[in-house]
Structures are given as structure tokens and as C-alpha cells.
């Protein structure tokens, strides 16, 4: 039996250990942040509860019926994300919404490995540290972690792996990594379409078969998008439509997060880009994440579908750069676009010294000082942007995330609702009540055939807009003909049980 080549093993270890360490550091920081959020009772929206109900259903091999969205609501008719079924076994082992937060942190951290590894090949270990941490702690990834779990976290490592494969001209691997995006969210089929066009353009010198392959892949992306939004989503949506239209007036856009969703006319192209001004800030931060020069890479075109539906929409939160989860898909695209440009800058010098593009050696070749200085200069831009914007990003608030003094009272309210019960609640304990229970949100439960057995209210929840409420009277008023009695009241948490 032939022994492994020690030199080959050493090269593999050298190319992997530092990117892995960077990813682990980023992941540990994000997990620490998520746990701190959890202990501080921070609830940005109802979304974590929604996804917890969906994944809980998957863990039981059931359709993702999510009562939080409404009685009998199939979440596959909201956004199309069947890939979340893969999280069912994990949730079955660890049935908690906190599990989803940790899974998201791990997926984001995993995306750091290919990006940092490519940076290491191009710029050495210093480049891996610089690009790896600037990417891993990037604006959109921090925003996703701060906004808590969403389906797009699955897209982040896929985009990172696909982007690195594009830079290295491994077209088959690039297409394989990106194909599952059509199962993550419906609009990502358009991102796959743009990837096909980018592959076609970059591979045009390889002959007609390469061009046809790229065009076929682009066709796959556009067909997947059309089939999803025209057939699959309407078939599973209770209203028989695609729930998220550009004007924000469709059935799915309004969530208890704040922000206007009023329908309006589609604005002019100039207004789409510049009004309100926060759009310009988002574009600036995105370009900085690509070192500005990354915008010249054909890979950067993958940001266009996401920016198009966001900027053309009328929901205020679509435009922001500092706190929205859908920015996450832009960050790996920008990082890989930057590395693509750096790779092209340094490629002639590497070729001159006989360097192989796919070498596992972490030591960079020795191009001219000017090219290398330019590469380092643009590689520093994302880190500089991160430093400038850090105080506006979620991790800056980490020192303030201390355990809520009402945690014991919150746990008491949870314990008052037995497993197997149906319960209606506001946002504060929404996700925490999901394991083993049928959970409804107070804003979507009006069409229930049978009122919930329990009502749980946090009088301090933003869901009430400062109004004075209690579980007993609210439950009786919301469900005429039925009465509730208070069985738990402590530190603003109220639990009422249905008595008739």
C-alpha cells in the first residue's frame, strides 16, 4: 500500500488550516451574538417563529403548515424554500428556535472557508486574514445574523463556493454549487440566470460548447424562476398568487416589522436608484465590499436581480444596508468579484513563473510590485469599509446584549403552556413557544375555526403599539363567545387559559 506523499499532505493542510481557523472564529463570534440575543429576549420580527414552525413540520415529515401566518398556511406558498427540509433532522435532535440561529451562524461561517482560501492563494496568509475577516464580518452577513434566521442563509455558502469556482474557471463546479439556489428562494433563479450569462462571457474563448453550456444554464435559471412564481407558489399560496409583488400590496409583504407597504406606481429608473437616498448608501457599501474594482467582473452582475426587485419595490426595509437579511446574498458575490479581478491582475505574473492556477500551495507567486501593490490596495477596501461602518452594524451592540431580567418570568409563562396545546401570542415568546405546540400570532388568528386553548401576552411587546392589554380580556374579545381566565401573571407576561 502506497503511503501518502508527505509533501502533498503538507500542501493541503497549509491551504486549509488558516481559512478554517478564520471561519471558526467568525462562527464562534456569531453564535455568541445569537445566544446573547436569545438571552436578552431580542425579537426583531415574527420570522424566527415562522421558520421554527416550518422546520418543526419538516422534522415530522409533514408539509410546512405555519399557523403563525394563518390557519392552514403552507409556507411553500409564501417564499419557495423547500431546501429547508434538510434542517428537519437537526431540529428533531435539538427542538428549539435557537437551533436555527446556530445553524445560520454555522452556514455563514462555512462560507468564509472558500473565500479566505482563494484570498490566501492569491495574496498569501496575510490576504487570507484580511479578506477572510472583512468578508466574514461583512455588512450583509452581520445584518442577517442580527435579523435572526432566514432561508437565505443557505444561499450564502453556495454563492461563496460557486463564486470561487468561477474565479478558478471550474465551470462544472460553479454550476453545481449554484443550482440549489432555485430551492432556497424563488427570485434566486434569476441569480442563477445571471451566473449562466457570466459563465458564457468568461468562457467564450473556450469555443462553442462552452458558450452553449453557459447559455443552457442561464435558461435553466430563468425557467426555474418562471415555473416557481407562476405555477408552484400560486398553487400553494392560500390566495392563489405570488405573495410578494414589487408594489408591496400582495398578501405576503406585510409583516410585523414596521415599514410602509403601500402600493404605488413603478418609479422612473433614476428614482429607482436614488430615491430614497438610503439606496445610494446601500450601493456604496456594496461596491466597497467588492473593492470597487470588483464591479468590473462579470460575476458582479449576479447582484442585479436582488437589487432590482428590492429597489423597484415600495417596502422601506428593502432599501437599507445595515439591518436587512437579504443583503446577505450580495456579500459573497461582491467578495468573489473582487478576488476575480485580483486573480486576473496577478495571473500574467503567475504564468510567467510557471504557477498553476489550481495550485494548493498557499504561498503566492511573485508578480511585479505594482500589480501586487494594487491588489493589496483594493483588498483593503472591504476591511476599511467595515471599520467605517462598524458602529452601525449588529455586532457593535454585542456589549449591550445582557440577559433580560425578565427571563425567569418568561420561562414561567412558557412552562404554563403544556406541550400539544394550541396557543396564540405576540412576538416576544412566539418562537420559544413553537416546540411541541401549535402556535398562532395575534394578528393572523381571526379566521380560526377553534379558538386557541391558551393566550400568552407580553404587555411590553411592540406588537401592541403601547396599548394596555391583558391575556384574559384580549382572548375573550378576539374570540367572541369564548372566555379565558388568567393562570399566570409575572413581570408583564400574562397567560390565560380558555374556559369555554
Which residues are covered by each model-predicted region?
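Hydrophobic/aromatic-rich transmembrane helices and adjacent perimembrane loops
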Residues: 301-365
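Hydrophobic, aromatic-rich transmembrane alpha-helices
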Residues: 274-307
Amino acid at each position: 500500500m502506497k503511503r501518502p506523499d508527505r509533501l502533498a499532505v503538507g500542501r493541503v493542510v497549509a491551504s486549509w488550516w488558516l481559512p478554517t481557523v478564520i471561519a471558526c472564529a467568525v462562527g464562534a463570534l456569531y453564535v455568541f451574538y445569537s445566544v446573547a440575543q436569545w438571552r436578552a429576549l431580542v425579537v426583531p420580527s415574527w420570522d424566527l417563529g415562522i421558520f421554527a414552525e416550518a422546520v418543526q413540520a419538516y422534522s415530522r415529515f409533514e408539509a410546512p403548515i405555519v399557523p403563525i401566518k394563518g390557519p392552514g398556511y403552507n409556507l411553500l406558498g409564501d417564499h419557495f424554500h423547500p431546501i429547508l427540509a434538510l434542517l428537519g433532522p437537526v431540529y428533531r435532535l435539538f427542538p428549539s428556535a435557537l437551533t436555527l440561529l446556530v445553524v445560520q451562524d454555522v452556514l455563514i461561517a462555512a462560507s468564509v472557508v472558500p473565500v479566505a482560501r482563494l484570498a490566501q492563494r492569491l495574496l498569501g496568509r496575510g490576504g487570507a486574514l484580511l479578506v477572510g475577516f472583512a468578508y466574514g464580518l461583512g455588512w450583509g452577513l452581520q445584518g442577517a445574523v442580527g435579523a435572526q434566521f432566514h432561508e437565505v442563509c443557505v444561499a450564502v455558502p453556495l454563492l461563496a463556493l460557486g463564486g470561487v469556482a468561477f474565479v478558478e474557471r471550474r465551470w462544472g463546479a460553479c454550476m453545481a454549487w449554484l443550482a440549489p439556489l432555485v430551492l432556497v428562494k424563488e427570485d434566486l433563479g434569476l441569480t442563477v440566470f445571471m451566473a449562466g450569462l457570466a459563465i458564457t462571457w468568461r468562457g467564450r474563448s473556450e469555443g462553442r460548447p462552452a458558450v452553449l453550456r453557459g447559455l443552457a444554464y442561464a435558461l435553466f435559471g430563468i425557467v426555474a424562476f418562471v415555473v416557481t412564481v407562476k405555477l408552484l407558489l400560486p398553487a400553494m399560496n392560500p390566495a392563489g398568487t405570488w405573495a410578494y409583488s414589487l408594489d408591496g400590496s400582495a398578501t405576503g409583504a406585510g409583516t410585523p416589522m414596521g415599514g410602509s407597504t403601500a402600493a404605488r406606481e413603478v418609479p422612473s429608473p433614476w428614482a429607482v436608484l436614488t430615491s430614497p437616498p438610503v439606496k445610494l448608501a446601500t450601493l456604496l457599501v456594496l461596491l466597497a465590499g467588492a473593492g470597487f474594482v470588483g464591479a468590473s467582473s462579470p460575476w458582479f452582475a449576479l447582484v442585479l436581480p436582488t437589487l432590482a426587485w428590492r429597489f423597484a419595490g415600495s417596502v422601506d426595509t428593502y432599501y437599507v444596508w445595515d439591518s436587512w437579511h437579504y443583503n446577505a446574498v450580495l456579500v459573497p458575490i461582491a467578495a468573489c468579484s473582487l478576488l476575480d479581478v485580483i486573480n486576473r491582475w496577478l495571473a500574467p505574473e503567475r504564468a510567467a513563473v510557471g504557477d498553476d492556477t489550481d495550485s494548493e500551495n498557499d504561498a503566492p507567486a511573485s508578480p511585479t510590485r505594482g500589480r501586487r501593490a494594487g491588489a493589496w490596495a483594493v483588498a483593503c477596501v472591504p476591511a476599511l469599509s467595515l471599520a467605517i461602518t462598524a458602529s452601525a452594524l449588529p455586532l457593535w451592540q454585542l456589549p449591550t446584549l445582557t440577559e433580560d431580567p425578565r427571563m425567569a418570568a418568561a420561562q414561567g409563562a412558557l412552562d404554563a403552556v403544556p406541550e400539544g396545546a394550541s396557543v396564540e401570542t405576540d412576538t416576544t415568546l412566539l418562537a420559544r413557544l413553537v416546540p411541541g405546540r401549535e402556535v398562532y400570532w395575534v394578528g393572523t388568528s381571526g379566521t380560526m375555526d377553534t379558538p386557541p386553548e391558551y393566550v400568552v401576552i407580553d404587555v411590553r411587546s411592540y406588537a401592541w403599539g403601547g396599548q394596555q392589554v391583558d391575556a384574559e380580556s384580549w382572548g375573550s374579545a378576539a374570540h367572541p363567545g369564548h372566555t379565558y381566565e388568567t393562570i399566570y401573571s409575572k413581570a408583564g407576561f400574562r397567560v390565560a387559559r380558555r374556559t369555554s
